[in-house]
Amino acid sequence: MTRRVACTQSRLCGNFFVLIVLGVITLVYFSVMLHYTEHLEDRSSQLFLAVLHLSLFMLVWSFAQAMLTDPGEVPPFWGFHMGDSEQKRRRYCLMCHVFKPERCHHCSACNRCVLNMDHHCPWINNCVGFYNRKFFMLLLVYVLLTTYLVAAGMTFPVWNLLNDLYVHPVVTDYKPFLIVCGYALDVLLAGVISMFFRFHLHLVSTNTTTIETMDKAGHKPGEVVST
């Protein structure tokens, strides 16, 4: 489903978060390639880079799908034939002028009602809803896979690099700095996304959403939940 974009201040700010994501991916990838371009003749390095590039491709693909897929909108004239007038009053959105099905919420960032809304994610500059939640989960899977691969492939090179820097503390180029920074950022990202993925895996397995979980925790009804 083609995404319908509403131009709001939150939407414009979301573009900045998307650029941050792309910048992090580029930095981590560049730090890995700085090391492995010097070992391309090694079969194990070739295998590692092949698997890494496949995982990275799937990460970028799922990121694009989660960002560009419309999360879902209320079908035209839905709910006009509901018999309970009190229910119709409670489920009517005064901003979109539609009757909202269950789990449909109005997102102030997107300025629209979203089907089966889980939360608004600024990192993909989109709501996670009915049609793109699977892509969002795939994105988390491939982020974890890619960050774990980078951590596995760069731990010993970074360890050796730090030992060399301890013995010879004079740095003559930028490569050691970028490699260490990229590795540290990758490990941090792997830890954060691991907890985030565990939370969303629990939501999927229990057939619930972030908004419902936050409502149970005492958030105000209608409050936009974002990651």
Question: Language model features by range: what are they?
Answer:
Residues 1-227:
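Membrane-associated feature with strongest affinity for ZDHHC
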